[in-house]
Amino acid sequence: MDTKLLELLVCPVTKGHLEYDREKHELISRSARLAYPVRDGIPVMLENEARTLTDEELGL
């Protein structure tokens, strides 16, 4: 994922910072506890396409 693009993107739910998980190809919003998929290099920033993160995934 392009780092400049990542700097511009925010979580559509919280408007907060996103982290890119290279292994799972997901953008992580810790504040919303959601992981948005990146398909073919394109972030899918739809809440209904995101999966909920577990406490373990968040390191809690």
Curated annotation (Swiss-Prot):
Record-level GO cellular component terms: cytosol
Domain of life from the UniProt record: Bacteria
Disulfide bridge positions per record: none
SUPFAM superfamilies: Trm112p-like (SSF158997)
Signal peptide start-end: none
Family as reported in the entry's similarity comment: Belongs to the UPF0434 family.
Protein name: UPF0434 protein Pnap_1922
Species in which this protein is naturally found: Polaromonas naphthalenivorans (strain CJ2)
Upper lineage: Bacteria, Pseudomonadati, Pseudomonadota, Betaproteobacteria, Burkholderiales
